[in-house]
Design a protein with these regions (language model features):
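Catalytic nucleophile loop of clan PA
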Residues: 2-21
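Short Gly/Pro-enriched turn/cap motifs at secondary-structure boundaries
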Residues: 1-2, 88
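A short acidic, helix-capping loop that chelates divalent metal ions and anchors anionic groups
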Residues: 29-32, 74
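Flexible, gly/ser-rich surface segments that form the specificity/activation loops bordering the active-site cleft
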Residues: 3, 28-30, 50, 54-55
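Short, solvent-exposed secondary-structure boundary/capping segments
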Residues: 8, 31-34, 167-172
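C-terminal recognition in membrane/secretory proteostasis and scaffolding
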Residues: 13-14, 18, 43-179
């Protein structure tokens, strides 16, 4: 059980294998019942390696703003209808709809507004959180293959991921020194 004050413990499966680190509990009562959130081991492993090697987590960015295309339980009826209409217009049922490509970002000059990201490195992207999870496993400078639907056709592009400063250099924590 995850209770207030004891997050950070191991999340194991029925075989006793580590699958994540408990990070947060959302509960109306504050204990026992509610929703528990964990960081998957695939992301945790990269975070630990980054902290050891660089003193801070190296975050790779695609350089887009977007939203999940398709219906979502949290959408109101009007928004769900708009998203369904947009999906039909673009010829795709789900993925990440690009609203804007950030100037100087990894996707600049390659991806476009109204492209729908449906895959990254051979894995399907159904919603925005799928894209976030895939990017969390990478560092600036890594190359990724991004599959999109553009003009109702599937296309694939190779992009070099950048950091928040728009380059591929290691970001150092200002308060720490590398040894």
């Amino acid at each position: 059980a995850i209770n207030q004050g004891n997050s950070g413990g191991a999340l194991v499966n029925a075989r006793g294998e580590l699958v994540g680190i408990n990070a947060m509990l959302y509960s109306p009562t504050g204990a026992y019942s509610g929703y528990g959130f964990a960081i998957p081991t695939s992301i945790m492993t990269k975070v630990v390696a980054d902290l050891k090697q660089f003193g801070t987590v190296q975050r790779a960015l695609l350089g887009i703003t977007g939203t999940t295309l398709g219906t979502d339980l949290q959408m109101d009826e009007r928004l769900a209808e708009e998203m369904k209409k947009k999906a039909d217009e673009l010829g795709v049922k789900e993925g990440v709809l690009i609203a804007e490509v950030v100037e100087g970002g990894s996707a600049a000059g390659v991806l476009k507004s109204d492209d729908v990201i449906i895959g990254i490195d051979g894995k399907k992207v159904h919603k925005f959180t799928d894209l976030q999870e895939a990017l969390a496993k990478h560092r600036p400078g890594d190359k990724v293959k991004v599959k999109v639907i553009r003009d109702k056709k599937e296309k694939e592009f190779e992009l070099t991921l950048k950091n928040s400063q728009g380059n591929t250099k290691v970001v150092k924590d200002a308060g720490m020194e590398l040894l």
